[in-house]
């Protein structure tokens, strides 16, 4: 299968390698070309613009920094759906692994729907585009953290009946769920970090039409051990915000516990053994207590990324009228950490944020 991937960073690079090992042809684009070229030895094919991916690939996966990067990658002049969406006749699925606000995701889905509606009309009316004739699992020619898509996300949609007829028809290819000519956008943020991406055990929280999520599950299964359909477009991003809320609050509490242990004269490194098997035990406890009590370990994740996500949590809480006093405190800890120059450190840096203002020696 022809796959495009935008964003071969710390998470994206191992995901691409899993796709290649699964037998897919993967075309890679990145703003910094060297990061894409580093994957050539693994079998990836590098392209100069996202536009090339839309012309060659049936599915394009995004794993970029933020909503602005998603917008530029998809809707920019050289983006997937840039100057002329009709050029992307092969493209059927945009799967966004980036972590961005749910509202931005829904807006991007609606925008993509408007841009590709003309193409969808042509296909439903009998136009013979490549997107109509070549399914996601078929050989169609060339080589390498929004919403559901042209037909699925246009709101009041004159092509709904045609879509239903298409999906109701018998089709032995499980990937062929998109209506002819449409592009479906699935928001699919992930959890599991670089370790999960490397091991191929990521958890994917997906938002979009159920048929589309089911269609891309075999693809995502190359690097995910679980893909859960959370609901309509934007639901995956909302689930990711819940995930980040729990992770950051838990790690802030663990940092407080480590600090309390140290100031009380206890060897805090023994907390992993002493609390193992009890209610306080968790993957986060076992992973981060050693990182809070040792030095010289390579970071896993970046504080600045969590700051971005918790800022989104705060904005979403405001929009929905949701009281989140714990997350508000965590947000301030993250901001303080960034101001201390710890933006590239992982969340074990919470211990430094808590101890430095009190004059306690840091690690």
Predicted regions and their residues:
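NAD(P)-dependent dehydrogenase/reductase Rossmann-like domain
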Residues: 340-363
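Active-site-proximal catalytic alpha-helix in oxidoreductases
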Residues: 199-207, 228, 232-264, 275-287, ...
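Rossmann-fold dinucleotide-binding core
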Residues: 73, 99-131, 135, 144, ...
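Interdomain hinge/lid region at the active-site interface
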Residues: 233, 237, 281-343, 363
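NAD(P)+-binding Rossmann beta1-loop-alpha1 motif at the extreme N-terminus of oxidoreductases
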Residues: 1-62, 88, 92-93, 97-98, ...
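Hydrophobic residues within alpha-helices
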Residues: 15-16, 35, 108, 219, ...
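Beta-loop-alpha module in the N-terminal Rossmann-like domain of NAD(P)-dependent dehydrogenases
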Residues: 60-77, 98-105
